Every structure is written in structure tokens, then in C-alpha cells.
Design a protein with these regions (language model features):
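Residue(s) in the substrate-gating loop at a strand-loop-helix junction
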Residues: 59
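Substrate-binding pocket helix/loop in short-chain dehydrogenase/reductase
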Residues: 15-16, 20-26
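Conserved NAD(P)H cofactor-binding loop of Rossmann-fold oxidoreductase domains
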Residues: 7-12
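A short helix-coil junction within the Rossmann-fold of NAD(P)-dependent oxidoreductases
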Residues: 14, 41-50
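Active-site helix of classical SDR
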Residues: 39, 75
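SDR active-site lid
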Residues: 91-167
């Protein structure tokens, strides 16, 4: 075994007050513990090979936080912290194994359409859950899986610590670096404006 890609993930939307404890447990069990379990299961084999790489998928939301996504944000920030710590340990060990943390922007998958969302999300988006899912899917998921895979492979070959996928991820990374505290106010203002003018009305069946 020379490479492992921990990529499984789910999404959930709702306010902290509106979420149940079970919502956090579900997201963390897949998004974070899936990465931990996959890493620990294969790390001994990677080290035995003398030449290996661990690729853990965080998210654009592992770079900055957004209201209504506390469970998802927490899981992806956790993946980032875990992977950065792991990378430093591997660098110190000089064992021939390395690690990269991937931060995708909007990738054209079913993650938005299959996301679990509750009614409290309307307090943030101004829309019901189905409308929010569809709008996120239609407007924010731009990069194809094939494009994402190419960026990841190139990043692994270059032994990058952080792999950003998509212009949205690059812009978000820059925003967080330049405005580590102020960006939160910008997010609140922009999302408040978006919620105010969000399409309302009867939700339609979800389409891919």
C-alpha cells in the first residue's frame, strides 16, 4: 500500500440551537472519525512500504466557518487539524510517508442534494430545506470530480501540505489568511443579504 485517500463525507445544515446532538454525532462519525480510522488502519502498511502518502479530504469549510453549518464546519476543521498534526509527525519521523489535506470548493457531486437539513436553517438562508439544497447544488457546485482528481494527484506528486480545489477555495483561503477575524462579519453581512432576497415560495422536487 502506497497511498490512501480518505474522502467519505456527508453534509448537514441547521443552527446550533436547531440541531440535535445526534446531528453532530452523525456528521463527526463519518467526516472526522472516518478519516481517523482510515489513517490509523493503513498507516503501519504505508510506513512498511517506505514510500506512502495519506490524503485526507477536509473542505472549503475547513478554512472558514459559516452560519447554519456548525456540525459540518466542526468536522472539516477537525480533519484539517488532524492532518496537519499528522503531517508534522511524519516529517519528524522521516519515514518516507507524507500527508496532504485537501480543501475542495464546490464539487459537482450529490453532497448537497443528500444533505440532512432541518427547519432551523431557514433562519439563516431564508428558505426551506429543499430550496436551500437545490440552490446550493445549482449555484455553488462548479468543479467536476475529474478536475478535482487531477488537482489532488498533482498536489500529492508535489507533496503539498494543503491542496486547494477551485477558485472558490483559493479565494476563501486568501480571505481567511488576510482577514482572519473580519471575514466573519463579511460572511454574516453577505448571507443576511442573500437570505433577504432568496427565492421564496413552494419548494420543488429536488433534481440532479
Amino acid at each position: 500500500v502506497n497511498a490512501i485517500f480518505n474522502n467519505a463525507g456527508v453534509a448537514q445544515g441547521g443552527t446550533v440551537e436547531g440541531n440535535d446532538y445526534a446531528d453532530y454525532e452523525w456528521v463527526m462519525s463519518i467526516n472526522f472519525w472516518g478519516v481517523v480510522n482510515g489513517t490509523k488502519a493503513f498507516l503501519p502498511y504505508l510506513k512498511s512500504s517506505g514510500d506512502g502518502h495519506i490524503v485526507n479530504t477536509s473542505s472549503i469549510f475547513g478554512l472558514f466557518a459559516q452560519p447554519g453549518m456548525s456540525a459540518y464546519n466542526a468536522s472539516k476543521f477537525a480533519v484539517r487539524g488532524f492532518t496537519e498534526s499528522l503531517r508534522q509527525e511524519l516529517d519528524m519521523a522521516a519515514c518516507g510517508v507524507s500527508a496532504s489535506c485537501v480543501h475542495p470548493g464546490g464539487i459537482k457531486t450529490n453532497i448537497a442534494l443528500t444533505a440532512r437539513m432541518n427547519d432551523s436553517l431557514a433562519n439563516v438562508t431564508g428558505q426551506d430545506a429543499n430550496q436551500a439544497r437545490q440552490q446550493f447544488n445549482d449555484q455553488l457546485l462548479r468543479t467536476t470530480p475529474e478536475q478535482a482528481a487531477k488537482v489532488i494527484i498533482n498536489g500529492v506528486l508535489a507533496n503539498k501540505r494543503r491542496i486547494l480545489i477551485g477558485g472558490d477555495a483559493i479565494a476563501s483561503d486568501l480571505m481567511q489568511r488576510l482577514l482572519p477575524a473580519l471575514y466573519q462579519r463579511l460572511v454574516v453581512a453577505s448571507m443576511g443579504l442573500a437570505a433577504r432576497f432568496a427565492p421564496k415560495g413552494k419548494s420543488k422536487p429536488l433534481t440532479e
